[in-house]
């Protein structure tokens, strides 16, 4: 399966398949045959689990750079080490870099590619469900202790290869985390799709064909939005549904303690509560959605681990904040997102409602 992504700066495709890595890479033969060197950035966990398959199916010689797993790779230190590695290996503007791993590896690799010699080509080979989202659209970044993804660039890959073979060995928590972004895509685009997900016995056990179709839907939603707004000036903000409150939880906990998708799910419920005040959504739906999330194993304990005051400083660092006012992505109804300025007083009121709802549902 192919999903085209057409932005103002670059056109490319997302290739989806199962056990097709060699075939997919050969799609880029015209570009790759002109390259002088190949570099693969990955993390220790991915390389141990999937390195043999990758080496057996990657048709070129390459040098590998091993990163720590998860958000630990998105630091100044790892960014600097990656640049040093490329310089020492005599990487040139004719070289190609491959991001082989989850969303964090893709974010770091993309930012390295965007800034090394002012830009070298790279291809995303995501290995997690979560990365179906982050690998598409050209957002690259590293973290700062004061905020997630605060240092980065918009830089599109030459392509994205999603081989569902990698999902076969994902831990349950990683599947759950990635599926949260799929659910988010359904919420901003298609009420029937969300109803289908909420009616499923579980969103944790798709077979390979079902997973590929779900990923294709999610990628199509993102591709359409990114084509209209590459640098997040307008509709691309809709993709941040659940991320304002979710990022605050994630940052307060310390990156990696609460999985990104877990934090997004926490944020999605918060946005539903806030949306009740400005659209057609109501408390019974919000409660049903929370129960659906709990049934699928999403943890919400982190909400009660921090006071609203502890979350405030992280909320105010959200990249959508304008002139000191928080901008939340809300839903008029499922499939119809919008952005609204919300003051801290109202945020605190909704935070209190959230804690009350959790006390009711998590009994």
Curated annotation (Swiss-Prot):
Any one Gene Ontology cellular component term annotated for this protein: cytoplasm
Recorded family membership: Belongs to the sugar phosphate cyclases superfamily. Dehydroquinate synthase family.
Alphabetically ordered keywords of this record: Amino-acid biosynthesis, Aromatic amino acid biosynthesis, Cobalt, Cytoplasm, Lyase, Metal-binding, NAD, Nucleotide-binding, Zinc
Enzymatic reactions: 7-phospho-2-dehydro-3-deoxy-D-arabino-heptonate = 3-dehydroquinate + phosphate
Main location: cytoplasm
Subcellular location: Cytoplasm
Binding annotation for Zn(2+): 181, 243, 260
InterPro entries given in the database record: Dehydroquinate_synthase, DHQ_synth_AroB, DHQ_synth_fam, DHQS/DOIS_N, DHQS_C
Cofactor note: Binds 1 divalent metal cation per subunit. Can use either Co(2+) or Zn(2+).
UniProt KW NAD keyword: yes
Full protein name: 3-dehydroquinate synthase
Gene that this polypeptide is encoded by: aroB
Entry's Gene Ontology BP terms: amino acid biosynthetic process; aromatic amino acid family biosynthetic process; chorismate biosynthetic process
A single GO molecular function term of this UniProt record: nucleotide binding
Pathway given in the UniProt record: Metabolic intermediate biosynthesis; chorismate biosynthesis; chorismate from D-erythrose 4-phosphate and phosphoenolpyruvate: step 2/7
Flavoprotein as UniProt keyword: no
Biological function: Catalyzes the conversion of 3-deoxy-D-arabino-heptulosonate 7-phosphate (DAHP) to dehydroquinate (DHQ).
EC number: 4.2.3.4
Residues engaged in binding NAD(+): 103-107, 127-128, 139, 148, 166-169
Cofactor: Co(2+); Zn(2+); NAD(+)
